[in-house]
């Protein structure tokens, strides 16, 4: 699920593609096809269970052609930080529906009734890897900021977007005809 984490970071940093775009898109589609499970009721996991019963999630690993004799630890688990990275990778590859399916599965698991919505525990409560969720905001808004060029870039897709650059933050409203930037602080 995390084999393209370098590409994920390259996109977030505005570096573009590290490899062939077609191969990266194929890999993201394969991750969704083979690793996303709609219902874990019949899924065996001998390690920790961060997903149970009729919940959905993105497995750490899958073997469509047969499992390794000695797989790596945690292969049959889901972990929100890895799921968010994969989902954001899907956003960058134009797979918005699949990405939001993954993100919604996480949010449904952490709905406040079954699990704490403010502590997506992986290796303990408040584990930092789940902060990767914030990168979905950057991917959906196509936000890029350069302190060197003193420039900010945002999508032309109509909507309201959050932005921040380390010095200030606010919102951007994009319409068919206009872009309105509001600085809330900074």
List each model region and its residues:
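Extended glycan-interaction surfaces of carbohydrate-active proteins
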Residues: 1-79, 111-113
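Non-catalytic C-terminal accessory modules of carbohydrate-active enzymes
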Residues: 52, 83-186
């Amino acid at each position: 699920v995390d084999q393209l984490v370098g590409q994920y970071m390259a996109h977030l940093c505005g570096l573009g593609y590290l490899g062939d775009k077609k191969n990266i898109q194929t890999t993201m589609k394969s991750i969704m096809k083979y690793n996303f499970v709609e219902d874990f009721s019949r899924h065996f996991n001998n390690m920790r269970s961060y997903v149970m019963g009729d919940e959905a999630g993105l497995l750490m690993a899958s073997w469509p052609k047969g499992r390794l004799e000695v797989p790596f630890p945690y292969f049959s688990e889901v972990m929100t930080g890895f799921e968010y990275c994969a989902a954001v990778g899907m956003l960058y590859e134009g797979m918005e529906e699949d990405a939001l399916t993954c993100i919604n599965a996480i949010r449904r698991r952490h709905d406040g009734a079954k699990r704490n919505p403010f502590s997506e525990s992986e290796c303990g409560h408040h584990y930092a890897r789940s902060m990767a969720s914030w990168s979905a905001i950057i991917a959906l808004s196509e936000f890029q900021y350069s302190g060197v060029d003193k420039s900010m870039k945002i999508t032309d897709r109509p909507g309201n977007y959050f932005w921040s650059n380390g010095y200030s933050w606010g919102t951007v409203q994009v319409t068919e005809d206009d872009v309105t930037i509001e600085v809330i602080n900074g």
